């Protein structure tokens, strides 16, 4: 509670300073000189295009330029510096987004608004099968988003948007992009190329490919933490191999990823229809845990080999039917498989395939009311095969209908929506090799999650906005939460499901204060979520076959916290261009800033101090204990300089110690990172180019991620310097 009070006081001080600055600024400085940073379009927010400031929910969008510097081998690491978002950090090849302390089955990862279809929600060692290297943007909804995207979005949504299916006619017959990057921390070598070709009117084709390779992760000291090293024998302590005491590099943490996609569209003045095919391939290692394996025997190297193939089809049509302005249709079919390989043997094979389809219709405005209605059909088959299988084959079917409406009343906008879905889970008991996995209470399950939300946006002054959003959400349990029973060696866990689980029920509220113009811009948000029947992956303290036993357990839980980002612009937001007749008038000295006889123009240079932070407090209300793997208090300060050609920044990032821990969990020390970057834009002929250099953890500090199941054997990366380029034409 003391941390929360301290954080709230700091965030309140930032908001108070913002208000004070607003009171003393001249009128001309109130123009939204930085509006381009906050008015980016939200793609996942439904069929109606809206900006970040048009949503009652807390939304963050990373645009293409930002992603070029932030892109990492995993989606979780790419987003981990955003307020309210962290990465699960299991390995360099597997890190899933964690939003406000919630992860896995409560965070829905999408690609262009449809299901990614992998098994990254099933276990932390499974990587999201989507790459950020060629994405156009990544959009994050912090908090429940079940209205549009189902019960799996009860904690939030991450959508990776790309241009594989073109949606408009390009201005030239051929355009493209080439990217490259090198990072010294793990010897990352990555590259990407994308081409868009329009041979004739209406027809547009797109092709792209990317590849990423890293070696084992470099770390400042020992891979194992002090607690594990204290239990090693003297001979083991001197060793530097697997199962002993690696120093400087963590063995078996390499990543090999490549993906490609081709797409085509027919585009006309009232819409488009298109399709695409893509494949994602990845191989990555999992570091050894000497507390699980026999330290006298060199362990086999565990690695995961991922192969996903996907077919997409999308269309958008203007004025398709009476009463509707737009119809958006999406369809995706996916075939996914990965092998978990222990040495030369396949211990388990995970397979999933399925369909996600949705139709959204935007209604014509009725007075001040506008909105959309839609439906969704989702089907997924999941199987886990092999000696380490812990789940019988299952089929999950979801059918849903939803509505979202907005009522505009001058400075106030009211938003509300609802969703109802039916979910059926069928478990297949016919495989004689998997009879040991059958639970006595096992049977097919049916659920009927219902969700509703209401929000208000109040533009109470120029550049100021207050947003309040309330939600009631339900989430149906997944097949693995209900029926899992067996070992999972990659995570060193023995997993037991609970067939008696019911729907999670969540009541939440989110309040945001936003400032989009003036000397200080940014936002501050606070949230509260109360769960009944919260499905927790709970350690029992028991050991089965050398593995820690975890059980899916329902409980009452609450999450609350805050996040903020504030930019203090240190240069004038506007410059003045004098009128010709005043050019020689000595009385026109006011034109240095702004004045009645001058013409204000946006200052192309921006020097700003950015302060940001976030805090999450999560409690098991049945016992009063903290929930496990909750993001610690984080805050940072950076000085940034941007011009039309240059951008540079230096940042100090602090992650506090996490000592508010669940039973059978250990505390994690805090750490401080010093980061810096510089980039330059230039044009050569018909090409536009961007080059950059970025340094992370420049002081080479040892750090461990509290959210990672492997934090005791896998530190965060040491000092790294990355260099990259992007060329478009």
Residue ranges of predicted features:
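Gram-negative outer-membrane beta-barrel transporters
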Residues: 24, 369-371, 521-531, 550-658, ...
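Short acidic/polar hinge/loop motifs at secondary-structure boundaries
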Residues: 115-144
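Outer-membrane beta-barrel signature, preferentially recognizing the C-terminal barrel domain
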Residues: 292, 299-314, 318-320, 441-459, ...
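Transmembrane beta-barrel wall of Gram-negative outer-membrane proteins
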Residues: 184-213, 225-283, 305-319, 365-369, ...
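C-terminal beta-signal and adjacent terminal beta-strands/loops
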Residues: 474, 530-532, 582-596, 603, ...
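Flexible loop and strand-edge segments within Gram-negative outer membrane beta-barrel domains
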Residues: 251-257, 270-327, 333-354, 387-395, ...
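Short, acidic, small-residue-rich periplasmic hinge/interaction motif at the N-terminus
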Residues: 23-68, 76, 104
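Extracytoplasmic beta-strand/coil segments of soluble accessory domains associated
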Residues: 76-118
């Amino acid at each position: 509670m003391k941390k929360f009070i301290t954080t709230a006081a700091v965030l309140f001080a930032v908001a108070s300073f913002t208000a004070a600055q607003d009171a003393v600024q001249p009128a001309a400085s109130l123009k939204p000189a930085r509006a381009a940073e906050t008015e980016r379009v939200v793609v996942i927010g439904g069929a109606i295009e809206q900006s970040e400031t048009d949503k009652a929910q807390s939304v963050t969008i990373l645009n293409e330029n930002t992603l070029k510097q932030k892109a990492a081998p995993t989606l979780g690491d790419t987003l981990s510096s955003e307020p309210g978002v962290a990465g699960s950090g299991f390995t360099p090849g597997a890190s899933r987004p964690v939003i406000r302390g919630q992860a896995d089955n409560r965070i829905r990862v999408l690609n262009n608004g449809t299901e990614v279809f992998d098994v990254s929600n099933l276990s932390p060692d499974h990587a999201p099968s989507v790459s950020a290297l060629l994405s156009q943007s990544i959009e994050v909804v912090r908090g429940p988003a079940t209205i549009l995207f189902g019960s799996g979005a009860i904690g939030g949504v991450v959508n990776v948007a790309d241009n594989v299916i073109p949606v408009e006619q390009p201005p030239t017959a051929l355009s493209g992009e080439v990217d490259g990057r090198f990072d010294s921390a793990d010897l990352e070598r990555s590259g990407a190329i994308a081409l868009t070709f329009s041979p004739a009117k209406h027809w547009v084709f797109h092709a792209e490919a990317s590849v990423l390779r890293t070696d084992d992760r470099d770390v400042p000291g020992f891979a194992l933490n002090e607690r594990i090293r204290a239990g090693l024998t003297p001979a083991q302590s001197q060793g530097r191999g697997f199962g002993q005491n690696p120093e400087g590099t963590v063995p078996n943490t390499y990543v090999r990823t490549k993906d490609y996609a081709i797409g085509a569209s027919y585009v006309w003045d009232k819409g488009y229809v298109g399709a695409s095919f893509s494949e994602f391939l990845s191989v990555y290692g999992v570091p050894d845990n000497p507390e699980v394996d026999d330290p006298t025997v060199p362990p086999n190297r565990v690695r995961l080999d991922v192969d996903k193939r996907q077919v997409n089809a999308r269309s958008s049509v203007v004025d398709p039917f009476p009463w509707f302005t737009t119809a958006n249709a999406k369809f995706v079919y996916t075939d996914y498989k990965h092998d978990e390989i222990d040495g030369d043997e396949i211990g388990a094979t995970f397979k999933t395939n399925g369909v996600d389809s949705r139709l959204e219709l935007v209604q014509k405005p009725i007075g001040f009311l506008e909105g959309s209605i839609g439906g969704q059909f989702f089907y997924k088959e999941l199987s886990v095969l092999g000696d380490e299988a812990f789940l019988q084959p299952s089929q999950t079917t979801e059918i849903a209908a939803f509505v979202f409406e907005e009522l505009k009343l001058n400075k106030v906008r009211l938003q509300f929506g609802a969703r109802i879905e039916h979910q059926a889970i069928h478990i297949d008991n016919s495989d004689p090799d998997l009879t040991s996995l059958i639970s006595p209470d096992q049977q097919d399950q049916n659920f009927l999650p219902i969700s509703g939300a209401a929000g208000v946006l109040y533009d109470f002054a120029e550049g100021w906005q207050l947003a309040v959003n309330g939600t009631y959400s339900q989430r149906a349990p997944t097949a693995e939460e209900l029926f899992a029973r067996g070992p999972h060696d990659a995570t060193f866990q023995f997993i037991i499901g609970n067939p008696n689980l019911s729907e999670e029920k969540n009541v939440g509220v989110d309040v945001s204060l936003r400032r989009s113009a003036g000397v200080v811009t940014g936002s501050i948000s606070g949230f509260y979520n109360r769960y009944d029947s919260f499905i927790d992956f709970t350690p029992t303290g028991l050991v089965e076959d050398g593995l820690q036993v975890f059980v899916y357990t329902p409980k009452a839980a609450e999450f609350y916290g805050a996040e903020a980002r504030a930019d203090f612009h240190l240069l004038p937001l506007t410059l003045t261009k004098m009128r010709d007749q005043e050019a020689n008038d000595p009385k026109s000295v006011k034109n240095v800033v702004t004045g009645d006889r001058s013409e204000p123009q946006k200052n192309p240079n921006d020097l700003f101090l950015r302060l940001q932070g976030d805090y999450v407090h999560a409690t098991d209300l049945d016992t009063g204990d903290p929930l496990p793997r909750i993001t610690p208090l984080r805050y940072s300060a950076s000085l940034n300089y941007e011009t039309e050609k240059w951008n540079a920044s230096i940042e100090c990032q602090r992650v506090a110690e996490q000592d508010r821990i669940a039973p059978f969990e250990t505390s994690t020390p805090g750490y401080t990172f010093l980061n810096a970057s510089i980039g330059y834009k230039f044009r050569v002929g018909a090409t536009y180019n961007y080059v950059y250099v970025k340094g992370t953890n420049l002081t080479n500090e040892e750090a461990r991620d509290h959210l990672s199941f492997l934090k005791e054997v896998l530190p965060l990366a040491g000092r790294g310097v990355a260099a990259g380029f992007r060329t478009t034409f």
